[in-house]
Amino acid sequence: MAYQSEYALENEMMNQLEQLGYERVTIRDNKQLLDNFRTILNERHADKLEGNPLTDKEFQRLLTMIDGKSIFESARILRDKLPLRRDDESEIYLSFLDKKSWCKNKFQVTNQVSVEDTYKARYDVTILINGLPLVQVELKRRGIDINEAFNQVKRYRKQNYTGLFRYIQMFIISNGVETRYFSNNDSELLKSHMFYWSDKQNNRINTLQSFAESFMRPCQLAKMISRYMIINETDRILMAMRPYQVYAVEALIQQATETGNNGYVWHTTGSGKTLTSFKASQILSQQDDIKKVIFLVDRKDLDSQTEEEFNKFAKGAVDKTFNTSQLVRQLNDKSLPLIVTTIQKMAKAIQGNAHLLEQYKTNKVVFIIDECHRSQFGDMHRLVKQHFKNAQYFGFTGTPRFPENSSQDGRTTADIFGRCLHTYLIRDAIHDGNVLGFSVDYINTFKNKALKAEDNSMVEAIDTEEVWLADKRVELVTRHIINNHDKYTRNRQYSSIFTVQSIHALIKYYETFKRLNKKLEQPLTIAGIFTFKPNEDDRDGEVPYHSREKLEIMISDYNKKFETNFSTDTTNEYFNHISKNVKKGVKDSKIDILIVVNMFLTGFDSKVLNTLYVDKNLMYHDLIQAYSRTNRVEKESKPFGKIVNYRDLKKETDDALRVFSQTNDTDTILMRSYEEYKKEFMDAYRELKMIVPTPHMVDDIQDEEELKRFVEAYRLLAKIILRLKAFDEFEFTIDEIGMDEQENEDYKSKYLAVYDQVKRATAEKNKVSILNDIDFEIEMMRNDTINVNYIMNILRQIDLEDKAEQRRNQEQIRRILDHADDPTLRLKRDLIREFIDNVVPSLNKDDDIDQEYVNFESIKKEAEFKGFAGERSIDEQALKTISNDYQYSGVVNPHHLKKMIGDLPLKEKRKARKAIESFVAETTEKYGV
């Protein structure tokens, strides 16, 4: 049977959308798009216009107000009302989207709209709501990687989406059998923000036909755009909610408005509960019969975090309460429908000010409780419940309490909240790519196998600090971490947390790391944090120090490393700085290993954290919460969260995964065995060799389809290698896997050469190639050790008086440059070669090699600008101005560019603009490091 063509798929979709209720219209260019928009605008505002449609001047004034805006600003305008001055000086307000009565909007669909700006483009399927193109659908025929459609959208958005197309809210991409949706944005579109749609039971809806049936019905689509897309005010981005978030909010709203019952939402850690709970809170706060929505968090440190998150989603949506009296005032303020506070403050407010809160004894109040397994167990909840007689309680948790892991008083989450309204389990999140799976190692630190036996009496007998914290064992664990940390974290590209059983253990490990660190060529950056008790027990004199003294030393070490000034009197500030450090790094440096007891193991999200070292006992919710610190999605170089256990927690891990994934099959959550990945590698390697038997044969490939096959085959191989490297037993040798590291490096060099070739051809020619939209996943190829700084370090070590040694160093650098995989290093490759060949031999021992290289680059950059400007007959200084602007903004200033190009014919103008944009981007990257 022949495959379905892209044209047939598009035609099938157009027919289906027409059947779903869209009006099929023919719009082929920008003029027809504007005419259609104007007609609908007049129809929708007929009453306000009083029989006088917008004149040409009035419509032009409107276009001036709404055109040329950023995607973020356009999204705001879409949801707002816009005042328009008419020719007779009267003023009317125009709206572009009915956000409440979704079905009252006008729905149209068209296809093959052609746009010609800098580049030509023809869009597949465009959905118009009230005449504005709000959803763009890009299709690929069956069998084509869906990522090619994603990359095509990125290319179109960068080159072609102007005018009313700036109002696109959402993209849908499909190859017929796989379909995704994602929000439009000014910033770079990320693959991690492409979402699957699913049903309420989290069954994925993949085919384009079933996706359209469920997601693209006119009223449903308008509802999705109006209610379930969020304007993030802080980051100035549009966010589309995922299906499970939508279903949870719908279920919660229904429970709150149609019943008087409570309920809870079980969404796994890392799945975006804050956004879900915010949207539910926001919608409930707009209901007339609900007098107040109170969002409760448990801990002080989460209070500000949650407020910050909420205000991202709607500026000023939350008034954080700083003290009890302020909370009472806010509760009585009718202009504040939504409040974020802690359960501790709420309990105090009731205890001391119950008479001021009398109205809430009968008024309907809704409490939304974040991480309810922490905040809802205890006397404070009972106190709040006794006062608010007509309240409903809705909890959000990633790890509910069940009979197996119930609270101290034996209650489960269901005992307190009643029915579970929606679930999204860890296996669902991993399947959808919303969180990562885990690679778990168990390192035996005892020679005596009896210590791993099932005998409980033996386990109890050895479960003492004396055994676990024996000097030899602590050093053994520390050395294992030091020896393997670079492998686990991809040469320190990622951070890690080390959790231990007690403050005493934390101190001992910190001091051991500190001692062993001194012997390392590249010392690890270690930090420790814990909460000390002012009047702590000295354990009968066993520990000859107060823990505060040790924390002071740790903070002092931290201050020296990061140029800060914290002390044990400012532990909150120290905590916040560490939190920021582990999330993003500080001043080009970051913590490699953070040692904790319990801190940072719940409620802390960091995409650049990928490894958890464990030397303590963990069970059920504590284990899942701790493991989940590592599994936030980042990029291709982070395929899983790495867990290294120095205790045998195999049973505890299996039990926790069984409970919280509701299945005995943990294969979807844990990485498969080494042998399985090895077999997968062998199959992929054979496939690669069938396409190109040797690396140098890549150079002989003329056919683009064949080149594409090579790219796809090596990309798959590289992904498997990334996973194999996580296993201790992996050896990159012919004996072990049939391929050695050198052969892989040779194939990788050819792969990167194809990438460079495609990138260069795309920049230089207005030509569409089947390779344009291939996803090369370059991040996966990077080795963060071999970069520009690495090369500069070798250059600094050159003995300028020893010519033989100098030649050896030069040859070493040439070999490294031949196999460079760092993008910036590849750009600088020719520069560095010329520097070591022509400049280094003439230097003497008194010369500063760094300064010499800076001078060399400066001369080369000046020559490049002069040469390019002369060749194109453009003003060199104007070119430098554009380049300087680009360096800070990342955007080529269109006004400066237009002025520089002047009055060339359209075709020549397009060619010149493309060449200048490409030159500016490449030279900025090349000379910017």
UniProtKB/Swiss-Prot annotation:
CDD domains: DEXHc_RE_I_HsdR (cd18030), HsdR_N (cd22332), SF2_C_EcoR124I-like (cd18800)
Enzyme Commission number, as recorded: 3.1.21.3
The reaction(s) this protein catalyses: Endonucleolytic cleavage of DNA to give random double-stranded fragments with terminal 5'-phosphates, ATP is simultaneously hydrolyzed
Superkingdom of origin: Bacteria
TM helices/strands, residue ranges: none
InterPro entries linked to this entry: Helicase_ATP-bd, HsdR_RecA-like_helicase_dom_2, P-loop_NTPase, Restrct_endonuc_type1_HsdR_N, Restrct_endonuc_typeI_HsdR, SWI2_SNF2, Type-I_R_enzyme_R_subunit, TypeI_RM_Rsu_C
Annotated ranges, domain Helicase ATP-binding: 254-418
Keywords: ATP-binding, DNA-binding, Endonuclease, Hydrolase, Nuclease, Nucleotide-binding, Restriction system
GO MF terms, alphabetically ordered: ATP binding; DNA binding; type I site-specific deoxyribonuclease activity
Cited function: The restriction (R) subunit of a type I restriction enzyme that may recognize 5'-AGGN(5)GAT-3' and cleaves a random distance away. Subunit R is required for both nuclease and ATPase activities, but not for modification. After locating a non-methylated recognition site, the enzyme complex serves as a molecular motor that translocates DNA in an ATP-dependent manner until a collision occurs that triggers cleavage.
Note: Type I restriction and modification enzymes are complex, multifunctional systems which require ATP, S-adenosyl methionine and magnesium as cofactors and, in addition to their endonucleolytic and methylase activities, are potent DNA-dependent ATPases.
Assembly, per entry: The type I restriction/modification system is composed of three polypeptides R, M and S.
Name under which the protein is recorded: Type I restriction enzyme SauN315I endonuclease subunit
Species per Swiss-Prot/TrEMBL record: Staphylococcus aureus (strain N315)
Gene name of the record: hsdR
